[in-house]
Amino acid sequence: MHTMIPDDNFRFIALDVETACSDAASICQIGLACVWPDNRIHTFSTLVNPCSDFDAFNIRLHGIGPEHVRNAPRFDEVLDLLFPVLSRHHLVQHSNFDKQAVNAASRTYGFDAPNFHWIDSVTIARRAWPELKGNGGHGLGNLKKVLKLDFHHHDAGEDARAAAQVVLRAEAYLGVPFDRIGNPDRKAVSRHD
């Protein structure tokens, strides 16, 4: 596998995974959306051989099956290539699942969970658009509709790009940088902060 991620300095990288089954460690696709200082987005995705069985439910959800990953690299091989870039940046995930999956897959291969700096774009979306609570929510599916985002849901590269776009829209709407919006220690952020 050749990495298509420039060895560059990004504002942040959004990361999304798809899994083969209900086991969080069964990553079968990793997608990244690297956001440059001018807010251009470079998207990368790769299939991953989870070395596990696939559930029919997951295959229906993302369309990836055993035949697609047979010759794909394992998670440990992918992480070895991506670690130098990921470890230098804030990583955005849409919910806590992606971090859980990366940590679980790391443990499966016998190494500690990477000490990445994670920020949750759900938290950012909740702070930017609190009115969506109880009104469709802050999941990518509803944000796609509300923010008029164009992406194919349950493709890791597309979902990573969508999470990056959510963050960029929230920054523009609130006039506050993502790391202040997504900081769990901050109680509230407003357009006047």
Spell out what each predicted region is:
Residues 1-5, 146, 157, 164-193:
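Acidic two-metal-ion nuclease catalytic site recognized across multiple nuclease folds
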Residues 1-109, 113-116, 131, 137-154:
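Conserved non-catalytic scaffold segment of RNase H-like nuclease domains
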Residues 78, 125, 163:
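Short Asp/Glu-rich motifs
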Residues 99, 121, 156-160:
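Conserved glycosyltransferase catalytic-site signature
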Residues 112-126:
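Conserved beta-strand -> loop -> alpha-helix junction used to position metal-binding or nucleic-acid-contacting
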